[in-house]
């Protein structure tokens, strides 16, 4: 992500898949990528899985941290360090909002987030959790949340996909990507399948 007017660039680094390492978290550059500073680091076992910037205010950032470890015979996705963090000052300071009202309790796995360009304060999240996995929404920059869909088709292989994307022009349209492409036009209440050339949908971008 980047604020092109100030040459600020942000990178969400998930880190090494097979063991602990320090190259995880959120990194920030203020000179177009020449130099970098780590601005959010949870631990050597947990990295940043997703990152979203508010197009209306690029100082607002939200990220998800995923505790995970992969080996040749298994994948452990989730743990007590997984969570959601938000910054209102361009990444200088971060607040852990994982336990804010409305979010699911219990251990979290991989999560995706997307700030709506069409409605101030609205953020979408798709959350892998041992309790109440689903799509969540906030209208006040993460202070309180509500579960808007517990459709398990939206959680296909969440440790592998887990991407959500807010439509840039319609506040009630949101996309969820996994082995299928899902689209909602009613604020997340219902989703329909959108045909794609291949059943492996990791990301989406819409020209604003």
Each language-model region and where it sits:
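Beta-propeller blade termini and top-face loops
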Residues: 3-208
């Amino acid at each position: 992500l980047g604020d092109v007017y100030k040459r600020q660039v942000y990178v969400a680094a998930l880190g090494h898949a097979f063991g602990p390492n320090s190259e995880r978290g959120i990194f920030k550059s203020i000179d177009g990528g020449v130099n970098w500073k780590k601005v959010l680091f949870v631990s050597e076992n947990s990295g940043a899985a997703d990152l979203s910037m508010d197009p209306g205010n690029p100082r607002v950032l939200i990220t998800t941290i995923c505790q995970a470890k992969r080996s040749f015979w298994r994948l452990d996705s989730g743990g007590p360090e997984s969570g959601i963090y938000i910054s209102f000052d361009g990444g200088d300071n971060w607040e852990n909002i994982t336990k804010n009202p409305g979010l699911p309790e219990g251990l979290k796995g991989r999560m995706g987030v997307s700030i709506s360009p069409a409605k101030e304060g609205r953020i979408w999240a798709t959350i892998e959790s041992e309790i109440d996995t689903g799509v969540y929404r906030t209208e006040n920059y993460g202070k309180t949340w509500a579960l808007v869909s517990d459709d398990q088709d939206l959680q296909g292989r969440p440790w592998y996909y887990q991407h959500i994307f807010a439509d840039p022009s319609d506040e009630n349209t949101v996309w969820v990507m996994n082995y299928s492409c899902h689209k909602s036009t009613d604020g997340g209440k219902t989703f329909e399948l959108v045909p794609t050339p291949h059943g492996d949908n990791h990301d989406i971008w819409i020209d604003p």
